[in-house]
């Protein structure tokens, strides 16, 4: 994929093709090669070198423009569900990167969020429309409407919301051929990383990211029946345990089965997931 990306970049640079005139291949795997290269170069451990990406924004903008090209719009209905799922995950994550880069460095005054938060950008998620696959959609519409149709709650922890509290942004694009495996990896990593999940037998607590509560019905529908037998627990509590169950250590499983734990949602960390100048504390 690295060689392919380099070849594509060389051809485009040599031809001097403007982003709006670039007609991409309608094949999904080839379409996402540029994003794959950008993520590999600028993302580490879910954090982004935004200053460096800002200098590379031409390629990012060109990739996003390609997602709404006529060839893509006409080919989209022929893609499989997995190809469409990968497409929208990549589109969302790329659009968040573009949004941050356009306003970087972020310095906002809204007291409800950190000064460098993507939430300091007015309307970033709920108001700004983006042309993707022939539609005009906000980021919230992509998440709440388009991605919701796949009935796969793993997608919500695969979204890079431009925040430290988001699921870990991968250093590769999602692929239609591999998206199910990639999402399994996202889930497994999420379930064992203290940033998102803490199982503490000594304090009797299971602390988890609020992302699962934001999308409670989706997680309940997929994971509640996978829980241990936990009488008198709410559906979302059973769903959380069903979600975590395949990834529990023996001691953690023993603690959960006692059914004495308290489930708590940690505050979402809206600090920018920026690696420029060092990791966030």
Label for each model-derived stretch:
Residues 21-281:
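Interaction/scaffold regions that mediate signaling and macromolecular assembly across diverse proteins
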Residues 1-4:
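Positively charged n-region of N-terminal signal peptides that target proteins for export
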Residues 13-18:
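N-terminal signal peptide c-region/cleavage motif recognized by signal peptidases
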